[in-house]
Amino acid sequence: MFWYKIIPLDVLLFRDAKPFSPGERAWAGSVFPPNGHAIAGALRQLIGDKITCQIKGPFFCYNQETLYFPRPLGFVNSNPLIPLVWQQKNSLNYAFWDRQQPCPLLSVKNSDNSAQESFQFRQFLPYNVIIKYLETGKISAEDWAIQEEGEDQPWAVETRSHNALLESTRQVKDADGYFVENAIRLKSNWSLAIGIDREIETPTTIRLGGEGHRAILQRCDNLSAQWETLAKLSNQNFQIGGKSLAYLITPGVFERLHDNYQSICQSWPWEWKLAHITNSNQKSGQLVSVASDRAVPISCRMQYENRSIPAPQVFAAPSGSIYYLNQPQKLFQESDEATKQAKRWRQLGYSELLWISFEVETGFL
């Protein structure tokens, strides 16, 4: 796997996944960081029209040498959230809860969280903190404190006005010819980072996002070493087995065809069945609970009559989601039985998981 930095030359435009027409909505929203489809589109000019390589990311990179990942959502401030059923001595185990849904999560006070309200919390965590998280299952209170500018949000939003032009002309439309759009500017010393299983001669430029804005693609071997260390530790935790946490570091697309061939998305993999059952005819699985947030809409494109047209929206679980399992379980997207379409999501970098072993000795309980 070869790792690269993406350094924007100016602002970037990533229009949100909602249908947009200046006549209906004079304000075009923006979504950032870009999804795997946007990255694949930028790479097409370098590696060919048909993307067959494996993509990791995108993530953030600080000062050209450190990977940053979205904060795990299994915390309230610095206090970890633990499934109720994993806290056998808690009196709330006598309470009723809907067993057709994931188990409720309870906040467990961190032993070193004194004065935690006196600082701002990181929304993106550096490589060294994630390594400790994978090794111990804990993130100390001081590791949540912002130490570098941009760790709360590595980008700024700039509002730009646009004039819509008449087709095949350079004249502004008389009606609905003006709208406003949000542009993204990365803060100083920040860049995007991606991994690709293909070597590309760098430095080179790519078109990224809307309106042909350009960015520099630069090889960075430091990031390769960091990713290999994380992947090795994650695989070791997966092999250990037992109670585990799956940490989602890129948007997770978990969709399944239902009646009338309608695809439905949810915030955890469909193949991960709940560990608790409501009747004896059900087969229990390994999934105990989920810590997640609002779904992320993803707008793709598809071929229709030799034309590229907008595809139906897909809703992904947000980066940082945490899944609590009694035993680690692989994704269907990574299995040999997976369809070509299912494997495509992983190929584009979606649904990337890091595994953490959960032990009582870590101090959670």
Model regions and ranges:
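Conserved active-site/ligand-binding neighborhood in enzyme cores
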Residues: 2-365
